[in-house]
Amino acid sequence: MTKPNHELSPALIVLMSIATGLAVASNYYAQPLLDTIARNFSLSASSAGFIVTAAQLGYAAGLLFLVPLGDMFERRRLIVSMTLLAAGGMLITASSQSLAMMILGTALTGLFSVVAQILVPLAATLASPDKRGKVVGTIMSGLLLGILLARTVAGLLANLGGWRTVFWVASVLMALMALALWRGLPQMKSETHLNYPQLLGSVFSMFISNKILRTRALLGCLTFANFSILWTSMAFLLAAPPFNYSDGVIGLFGLAGAAGALGARPAGGFADKGKSHHTTTFGLLLLLLSWLAIWFGHTSVLALIIGILVLDLTVQGVHITNQTVIYRIHPDARNRLTAGYMTSYFIGGAAGSLISASAWQHGGWAGVCLAGATIALVNLLVWWRGFHRQEAAN
């Protein structure tokens, strides 16, 4: 992939961060609205959870089958095309009259919103080596802020005009972002000689042959499962007694998560300095402890907010560290590395959504917290029992 004479200016970093956040946000507008959507379509909580799962499975499919195209085609054209297609998926969601149609719209939106994961390696390619971790951290902060603020925006818009308004507005914003990206991004032509089947095959071969990639992918999978377990069921908790909050108030809890995400930005800088194993160990410990505060959240809003802050801080910190580490493996194949890592990441998210909805259905908030804490403990043990020693040695 040729590198153009194009300075990665602060303005371009901001544009790419906003675009990344806006793209990935399209998968999460539904989360604070699940209770309202479930009542609209007469669904159970577990059935409504499939809406979020469909978006994440669509995203996982896009990561595997579309993101590698960033190593094959000119990136600006690819990014703009996928942004417009994601906007089209949200139009289907906004006009849906059945659960099946809504799942189709959210799955298509998820499939093409992986444009966010083509923007991240593009930023890493344009950045100088000594600032790569910092730039990746900034772009990834935009991504997680998009996930979290999506809930706040969705709740506020739903209060103003109903849940469909959320998706109409989001579709227009994505179309406008496509125009901004066309004007702002540099052209980058591919130099790979691989065809599409070979490109996909190389994703699997990299995953099989590189233990660091597999390790980081597993950590990401389990970490994002934790994230989804919390956020999928939280709308049900807050809409029920003793809280009885509206969609707008539920969405405001995304601000606490956004604050946690912003606090994780230095993780990329620590990884640049060779401290990735320390950041990972500390982050996974905090992730486990966060579930104690979250458990008390069934009676205390303050405890829930503290738990959200800590969980989102650690999820984002570990994620930034993971990506900074894997981008060092093959600098000329960052889109394929992203595909392998992020496919695992969002499979974890989809599994977490299903686990969360089922845990809420059968065990209430205590069941959700038990599921989250168990997966956090497994994640820590997997890392502690061997993986971190090898990476520290490397």
Swiss-Prot record:
It is a multi-pass membrane protein. It holds the Pfam family MFS_1. SUPFAM superfamilies: MFS general substrate transporter (SSF103473). It is found in: Cell inner membrane. Keywords: Cell inner membrane, Cell membrane, Membrane, Transmembrane, Transmembrane helix, Transport. One of its GO terms (molecular function) is transmembrane transporter activity. GO terms for cellular component: plasma membrane. The chain crosses the membrane at residues 10-30, 50-70, 79-99, 100-120, 138-158, 166-186, 218-238, 243-263, 291-311, 337-357, 364-384. InterPro entries: MFS, MFS_dom, MFS_trans_sf. Its main location: membrane. Belongs to the major facilitator superfamily. This is Uncharacterized transporter YgaY. It comes from Escherichia coli O157:H7. The gene is ygaY.
